[in-house]
Swiss-Prot record:
This is Thymidine phosphorylase. SMART domains: PYNP_C. It comes from Vibrio parahaemolyticus serotype O3:K6 (strain RIMD 2210633). Signal peptide: none annotated. The keyword Glycosyltransferase applies.
């Protein structure tokens, strides 16, 4: 028998907690015998004294086990269960292509996604731009759609990692969000509760990333790989660039439109293709669906080009309540804004930098994201046809096309975009993918 305050005292004094102590504390969080004040104090001691890898593994497992851990064995999927998680960015629509691509190669992807957070877009908000798409199906429907389509993307249920929900809510109001140990446990407890056999983590770097520096992003990636593998789930991380909008679009309906066009081959943004392929290839290799990344990439291009990936996406949408002909007739279903017109730079020159975070916040300001949890999303607004770093902005090449509800909203968005995109000055290219971090690298 332990006392929460003694566990807090021990960590406050810089000592290492045992797995039993961490389990006891997190069970108390889940059953409400640990108070909000004690959660806040516990988080702050970790913030200042950090945790060893063994402590992080124990914390992640305790939070994972605080609620339901999905067991897919009764579904007899007949293939490996794989997933990916991204730390989030702007125009990061990879999940919508990646899930169907991996499914078409023989993987099963039961993906539990989130809503938009701050400047980053949420996969669930994008999918809800599709009429009828149900992000909260029963576990039976979740499993059946995953089996039939190879992929199902839904929202988190209250049964998964409930301790994380309490801890996160307290961290959010006590300045303890940005800590590697706590971020690692929060991300992984939810993902590992989904019954995965392997996971690929996409950690963003740059002006639109969650972590402030390359070094911090790399440290988080290493922590996630070490802890997830320590908890028994094969995991790899990739560090990818978020110094500019990833896709050609940012918003909800505009990104879904781009995802479908990507899957059907109508248009594939080269940066988006590279980052999506990098994540998918790691997933196939980890799941033993490909021998190496070259083999994986060949298989992935094949399912893109022969229509199998697009078919998996269509099957998922229909299985979760969306239109059966969505892939064929997406433009009939996705909401459109009243005003769709380009915005040009005030001067001619090379685009040398983007404040990607500011672009994400511009989408939020238009109503394409939430300031508070109760805000309604406007699915139609956003940007598309983004200029890329290194390209020349002039009277022929706009910065982007704005999808707005009114002239006034268009003007506001144009002003935000012009101040977020730097024209002129030195441009230093950055790679789409900086590096992979595998278990053997740690």
């Amino acid at each position: 028998m332990y006392l929460p305050q003694e566990i807090i005292r021990k960590k406050r004094d810089g000592e290492v907690l045992t797995a039993d102590e961490i389990n006891f504390f997190i069970q108390g969080v889940a059953n409400n015998t640990v108070s909000e004040g004690q959660i806040a104090a516990f988080a702050m001691t970790i913030f200042f004294n950090e945790m060893t890898m063994d402590e992080r593994i124990a914390l992640t497992c305790a939070m994972r086990d605080s609620g339901m851990v999905i067991d897919w064995s009764h579904m007899n999927f007949g293939g490996p269960i794989v997933d990916k998680h991204s730390t989030g960015g702007v125009g990061d629509v990879t999940s919508l292509m990646l899930g169907p691509m991996v499914a078409a190669c023989g993987g099963f992807v039961p993906m539990i996604s989130g809503r938009g957070l701050g400047h980053t877009g949420g996969t669930l908000d994008k999918l809800e731009a599709i009429p009828g798409y149900n992000i909260t199906p029963t576990n039976e429907v979740f499993g059946q759609v995953t089996k039939d389509a190879g992929v199902a993307i839904i929202g988190q249920t209250g049964d998964l990692a409930p301790a994380d929900k309490r801890v996160y809510a307290t961290r959010d109001i006590t300045a303890t969000v940005d800590n590697i140990s706590l971020i690692t446990a929060s991300i992984l407890s939810k993902k590992l509760a989904a019954g995965l056999e392997s996971l690929v983590m996409d950690v963003k770097v740059g002006s639109g990333a969650f972590m402030p520096t390359y070094e911090a992003s790399e440290e988080l990636a290493k922590s996630i790989v070490a802890v997830a593998n320590g908890a028994g789930t094969k995991t790899t991380a990739i560090l990818t660039d978020m110094n500019q909008v990833l896709a050609s679009s940012a918003g909800n309906a505009v990104e879904v439109r781009e995802a479908v066009r990507f899957l059907t081959g109508e248009y594939r943004n080269p940066r988006l293709l590279e980052v999506t392929m990098a994540s998918c290839a790691e997933m196939l290799v980890l799941a033993k669906l490909a021998e190496n990344t070259d083999d994986a990439r060949a298989k992935l291009m094949e399912v893109l080009d022969n229509g199998k990936a697009a078919a998996c996406f269509g099957k998922m949408v229909a299985g979760l309540g969306g239109p059966a002909d969505f892939v064929e007739n997406y433009d009939n279903y996705l909401e459109k804004a009243e005003i769709i017109k380009p915005v040009y730079a005030t001067e001619t020159g090379i685009v040398s930098a983007m404040d990607t975070r500011a672009i994400g916040m511009a989408v939020v300001s238009m109503g394409g994201g939430r300031r508070v949890a109760t805000d309604e999303i406007d699915y139609a607004v956003g940007f598309d046809n983004f200029i890329r770093l290194g390209e020349v902005a002039d009277s022929d090449k706009p910065l982007a096309v704005i999808h707005a509800r009114s002239e006034g909203q268009w003007e506001e968005a144009a002003k935000a975009l012009r101040s977020a995109i730097k024209v002129g000055g030195e441009y230093t290219p950055t790679p789409e993918v900086y590096r992979q971090i595998r278990a053997e690298d740690i």
